[in-house]
């Protein structure tokens, strides 16, 4: 029920599939990124820019974004509230 979330540079993801949006600086997340690359489950949506967030999906795919985690989370919540508002108006 979150719709599509813009993660930068015209890329969008299905909000319902997102498990976490995290900062990529910790060692465990760097290992997770490396493992996803080996398994063919890494999606790089940075367009060559610095990775500022890692998005983890329910299918164990790892998506790299050049947008800050806070910004993506804000877009996530804006989409949620917009969909909620639309659903409430439709019930009236």
Swiss-Prot record:
PANTHER family: REGULATORY PROTEIN SSL2874-RELATED (PTHR38449:SF1), REGULATORY PROTEIN TM_1690-RELATED (PTHR38449). This is Putative regulatory protein CTN_0877. It comes from Thermotoga neapolitana (strain ATCC 49049 / DSM 4359 / NBRC 107923 / NS-E). Coiled coil: none annotated. It comes from the Bacteria. InterPro entries: RemA-like. Pfam families: RemA-like. HAMAP family: RemA (MF_01503). Belongs to the RemA family.
């Amino acid at each position: 029920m979150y719709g599509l979330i813009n993660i930068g540079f015209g890329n969008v993801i299905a909000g319902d599939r997102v498990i976490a949006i995290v900062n990529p600086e910790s060692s465990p997340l760097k290992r997770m990124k490396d493992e996803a690359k080996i398994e063919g489950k890494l999606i790089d949506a940075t367009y060559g820019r610095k990775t500022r967030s890692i998005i983890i999906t329910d299918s164990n795919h790892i998506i790299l974004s050049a947008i800050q985690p806070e910004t993506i989370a804000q877009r996530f919540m804006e989409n949620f509230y917009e969909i909620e508002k639309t659903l409430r108006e439709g019930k009236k």
